[in-house]
């Protein structure tokens, strides 16, 4: 594990550059969102999104890096190039906000980024090696040089799972909370507002469909079960292998493949990358539209597996589902919506929110903290779940 590449400093980040308690303060915020196939960067002044840019990285480029930590210099350059392109001095930024994950699981909300959080994130103490973690590491890296404050919001390993979602058939081995929390909770809140209801009053199945795909059961404001997308659970995706019977994995390893290769397939070289040599969904979908039989089969299998996971979450919610929400970059393809409506429309109304609201969700949540309307959590350095009572007593 190349944790040494996170380039942490022993220096304490510089003090904030803005005065406290000023209601008219304009907060300049940089929002950093590394995904499995892209780096999305936004510059906000309070609620106003001044600039947003998504820089896409194709699979061959990303496969040059053995781990997500190794991508840190490349992603940092993307950030600095973005700032330079828009003539933004990083020293003028008040707040650095990074998407996070891979540290110990925490509760939902805004969290202050500190050194322990960054170190635990770099070591993957709470989950799989996913590029989302780099948001926290980059925010810390920039803040320690240029000053300001730094936060993360609803990282990928927020844990609200119900007890039945945790155990497996191996004693002491548990399913983890690892999903697109930020976008899913943001879209769920938007949908609830659209209905004139509270998120906490609804039962929803929310699906993030992009380079990674996760499907989550939201019960009265809590994500009680979810596919663990970056852990080899749920549908395969442009970059991920999805659920595969363990016996097939063992046979694959017996054929001479390494655990390192298998780990890479969890989030970087599986799915479309394995089948087509690219994570570019546009290229694959163009093949589908041209009638390529392999592309048609693989693409529709992905939709089929998405629907299977939605059905499973409907059972988790005991059939009492107020809506199925589809969001993420791949929802620009209408055939995904049609496939879900055909197979799952009988469960609940299906609503599409193309793209995602992650940048706005992070900026709005942190702005509420800066204005004193909400409080930020502190990283505990301990997971939300560490075993059942009978195990801790043993």
Question: What residues fall within each predicted segment?
Answer:
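Arg/Gly-rich low-complexity intrinsically disordered repeat tracts
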Residues: 1-10
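Short glycine-rich, Thr/Ser-proximal phosphate-binding strand/loop in the N-terminal lobe
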Residues: 29-70
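Short beta-strand-loop/turn "lid" adjacent to the catalytic site in phosphate-handling enzymes
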Residues: 83-131, 149, 157-168
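Glycine-rich phosphate-binding loop plus the immediately following alpha-helix
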Residues: 133-141, 152, 167, 172-203, ...
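Adenine-nucleotide phosphate-binding core of ATP-dependent small-molecule kinases
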Residues: 264-318
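Glycine-rich phosphate-binding loops at beta-strand->alpha-helix junctions
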Residues: 321-341
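Structural signal for terminal/edge beta-strands and the immediately following C-terminal loop/tail
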Residues: 354-394
């Amino acid at each position: 594990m190349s944790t040494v590449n996170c380039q942490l400093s022993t220096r304490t980040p510089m003090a904030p550059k803005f005065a406290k308690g000023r209601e008219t303060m304009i907060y300049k915020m940089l929002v950093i969102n590394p995904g499995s196939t892209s780096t999305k960067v936004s510059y906000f002044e309070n609620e106003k999104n001044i600039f947003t840019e998504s820089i896409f990285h194709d699979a061959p480029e990303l496969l040059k890096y053995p781990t997500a930590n190794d991508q840190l210099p490349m992603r940092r350059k993307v950030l600095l190039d973005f700032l330079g392109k828009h003539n933004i001095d990083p020293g003028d930024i008040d707040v650095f906000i990074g998407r996070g994950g891979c540290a110990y699981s925490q509760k939902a909300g805004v969290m202050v980024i500190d050194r322990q959080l960054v170190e635990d994130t770099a070591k993957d103490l709470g989950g799989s090696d996913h590029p989302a973690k780099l948001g926290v590491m980059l925010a810390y890296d920039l803040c320690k040089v240029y000053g300001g404050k730094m936060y993360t919001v609803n990282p990928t390993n927020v844990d609200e799972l119900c007890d039945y979602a945790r155990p497996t058939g191996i004693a002491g081995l548990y399913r983890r909370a690892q999903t697109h929390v930020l976008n899913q909770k943001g879209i769920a809140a938007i949908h609830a507002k659209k209905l004139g209801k509270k998120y906490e009053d609804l039962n929803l199945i929310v699906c993030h469909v992009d380079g990674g795909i996760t499907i989550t059961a939201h019960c009265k404001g809590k994500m009680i079960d979810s596919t663990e997308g970056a852990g080899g659970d749920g549908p395969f995706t442009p970059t991920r292998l999805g659920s595969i019977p363990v016996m097939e994995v063992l046979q694959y390893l017996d054929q001479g493949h390494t655990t390192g290769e298998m780990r890479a397939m969890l989030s970087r070289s599986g799915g479309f990358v394995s089948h087509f040599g690219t994570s570019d969904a546009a290229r694959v979908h163009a093949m589908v539209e041209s009638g390529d039989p392999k592309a048609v089969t693989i693409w529709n299998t992905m939709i089929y597996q998405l629907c299977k996971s939605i059905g499973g979450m409907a059972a988790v919610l005991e059939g009492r589902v107020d809506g199925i929400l589809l969001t993420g970059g791949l929802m620009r393809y209408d055939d995904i919506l049609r496939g879900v409506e055909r197979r799952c429309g009988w469960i609940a109304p299906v609503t599409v929110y193309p793209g995602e609201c992650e940048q706005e969700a992070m900026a709005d949540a942190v702005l509420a903290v800066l204005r004193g309307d909400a409080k930020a959590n502190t990283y505990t350095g301990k997971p939300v779940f560490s075993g059942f009572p009978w195990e801790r007593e043993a």
